[in-house]
Amino acid sequence: MLGVLLVLHGSKIPEWKDVGIKYAEYLSKYFSLVEFGFLEFNKPTLSEALSNLLAKGADKIVVVPLLFATGTHFRRDIPRLLGIDNDEKKIRYMGREIEITIADPLGFDEKIGEVLVKRVNETYNKNY
């Protein structure tokens, strides 16, 4: 069964958890197993979110970093926190072999660009 694991950076500001909840709820309309975890500062951690997916029966997991570009978190921290080798992409859990695939960072997307235009216009209209 497919599990989706959203990765958020995290912050000492508690509102970050609200963002994770909202994105997980949105994706739950399309996928039955969705969890989110943070790289640092907040709970659930990435390993806690992974454990939740595994306990619910996921045997294939797509990890979706909510990051704009590759960097240390993408290349090193996410695989390390999930317990996978960059080349292997498999873990063992209670005798089961679990495949983990990490999606590319968000990068440039016109839909994200549209959100940026919307934010600029909202801010301008509210302040000028």
Swiss-Prot record:
GO terms for molecular function: cobalt ion binding; sirohydrochlorin cobaltochelatase activity. One of its GO terms (biological process) is anaerobic cobalamin biosynthetic process. It holds the Pfam family CbiX. Co(2+) binds at H9, H73. Gene3D superfamilies: 3.40.50.1400. InterPro entries: CbiX-like, SiroHydchlorin_Cochelatase, Sirohydro_Cobaltochel/CbiX. Its EC number is 4.99.1.3. Substrate binds at K43, F68, A69, T70, G71, T72, H73. The active site is at H9 (proton acceptor). It catalyses: Co-sirohydrochlorin + 2 H(+) = sirohydrochlorin + Co(2+). Pathway: Cofactor biosynthesis; adenosylcobalamin biosynthesis; cob(II)yrinate a,c-diamide from sirohydrochlorin (anaerobic route): step 1/10. CDD domains: CbiX_SirB_N. Keywords: Cobalamin biosynthesis, Cobalt, Lyase, Metal-binding. It is an enzyme of class 4 (lyase). Homotetramer; dimer of dimers. Belongs to the CbiX family. CbiXS subfamily. Catalyzes the insertion of Co(2+) into sirohydrochlorin as part of the anaerobic pathway to cobalamin biosynthesis. This is Sirohydrochlorin cobaltochelatase. The lineage of its organism: Archaea, Thermoproteota, Thermoprotei, Sulfolobales, Sulfolobaceae. The gene is cbiX.
